[in-house]
Amino acid sequence: MAQKKAGGSSRNGRDSAGRRLGVKKFGGESVIAGNIIVRQRGTKMKAGANVGIGRDHTLFALVDGHVKFQRRAEGRVHVSVALPEAAE
């Protein structure tokens, strides 16, 4: 015969792992083509010059250069990659 009463069950106790979203390369940082700049859900930030947008709205660099964030009139942040000045 069991010496313990049956334990109750809990209906909580689950959580999903964080999705690692956010800015990966900040303003002024240098990037090479293909580097991920921002991981996001939806288009919180829009792609500007020399920035591509992935199927999951990830923004990535299309060329080598420096990251630039600009807040536009419509309130959205546009992310672009400025080309490095030619060294002479």
From Swiss-Prot:
Pfam families: Ribosomal_L27. GO terms for cellular component: cytosolic large ribosomal subunit. The keyword Chloroplast does not apply. InterPro entries: Ribosomal_bL27 (IPR001684), Ribosomal_bL27_CS (IPR018261). Gene3D superfamilies: 2.40.50.100. The keyword RNA-binding does not apply. GO terms for biological process: translation. One of its GO terms (molecular function) is structural constituent of ribosome. Belongs to the bacterial ribosomal protein bL27 family. This is Large ribosomal subunit protein bL27.
